[in-house]
């Protein structure tokens, strides 16, 4: 029975993430939705903790709204936390979500290398964990949803090569070093 619950939890979270990423086909999403809703009466509401690094980037506000709306339609509740760019605050909020006994913890990390310990605490508490967009390093999360960041870097490099005359200089401004995606985009760019 417990394994069935985890499958339903992952189905709900995965469905919400696929909806955000625009990767799921309509019929797949509807099947997952129906399966998740059928399981709700048997096992109670799924509780999802969703920890954002900040809402400075407009995308995160949009992702939050779509994620929460999709989860509610699937019968899950979402506790949204915003760390406002503070690693210390995000760790505190993740500990809060662990104490609230969420079933799944979805994290957009402020610092990809600073959350390892608190994510291990979540796993020890039996909470399924997911890195959303930014891989939390050495945390052994159950799921990682993101873009092909190396591919993004390669596409950027090709576009610049086609747009700039031979021998032209390129000055590249990147994101924060705490974001593992920066490293991956750079690898693809080179």
Where in the sequence are the language-model features?
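Sec-dependent signal peptide recognition
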Residues: 6-12
């Amino acid at each position: 029975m417990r394994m069935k619950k985890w499958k339903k939890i992952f189905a709900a979270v995965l469905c919400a993430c696929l909806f955000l990423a625009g990767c799921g086909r309509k019929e797949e999403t509807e099947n997952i939705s129906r399966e998740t809703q059928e399981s709700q009466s048997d096992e109670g509401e799924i509780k999802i903790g969703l920890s954002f690094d900040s809402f400075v980037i407009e995308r995160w506000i949009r992702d939050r709204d779509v994620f929460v709306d999709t989860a509610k339609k699937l019968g899950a509740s979402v506790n949204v936390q915003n760390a406002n760019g503070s690693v210390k605050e995000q760790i505190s909020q993740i500990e809060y979500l662990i104490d609230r006994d969420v079933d799944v913890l979805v994290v957009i990390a402020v610092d990809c290398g600073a959350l390892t310990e608190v994510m291990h605490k979540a796993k020890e508490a039996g909470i399924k964990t997911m890195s959303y967009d930014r891989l939390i390093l050495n945390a052994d999360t159950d799921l990682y949803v993101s873009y092909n960041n190396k591919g993004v870097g390669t596409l950027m490099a090709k576009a610049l090569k086609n747009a700039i005359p031979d021998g032209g200089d390129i000055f590249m401004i990147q994101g924060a070093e705490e974001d593992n995606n920066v490293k991956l985009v750079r690898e693809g760019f080179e």
